[in-house]
């Protein structure tokens, strides 16, 4: 649609936002601690192995990684409260569904911060389950194009037929491959082994349908809500079903 944008095309990942705020080490450390509860051996704990690999790619020092693992296993010795994974749901302007995943050591503080962000930006923090059914939880692997010509779609399709992929989308950087929630390790390992440049991988909430906003003021307020949520320290990811909306002046990409 001419003159319109899509949230999926302009959204900034939480990793980019955190890097600008200097909080990426803290966030990745929390993810490692939470994953380590299922076992401190990354060889037998895919979630921990994934968190460690992402931390190393971001330049997190080995000592920080080891401390995060120890804390998750209860061996940190600092007496601090453990972080827990919590999912919050709500609505933004125009009825846009918003799903927020957090890593928090204080539910009351986190809920208060989220409620304030929603209320200040035309939204409402809802009850658990109010919008979750509007999303599917799937595996996603981002690929970087390794040549100026971009992704070789024929080669990618051939490889995806051998893996548990449901499909792919071309992106500015390369391609986004997606598959069932349980197929993340198979997908990212398989793509690496076949020579693809894997940029990122993880589980994401994907909207089953989208809501288009046709009023500029409403769209701007919705984007402000999403950015306010992403800026909170406890927030791990923000997903929504915002579709197309009018081009906005001074829109940041």
Swiss-Prot record:
Family affiliation: Belongs to the TACO1 family.
Predominantly, its location class is: cytoplasm
Looking at the keywords, is Transcription present?
A: yes
Full protein name: Probable transcriptional regulatory protein SynRCC307_1833
Gene3D superfamilies, from UniProt? 1.10.10.200, 3.30.70.980
Where found, per UniProt? Cytoplasm
GO annotation, biological process: regulation of DNA-templated transcription
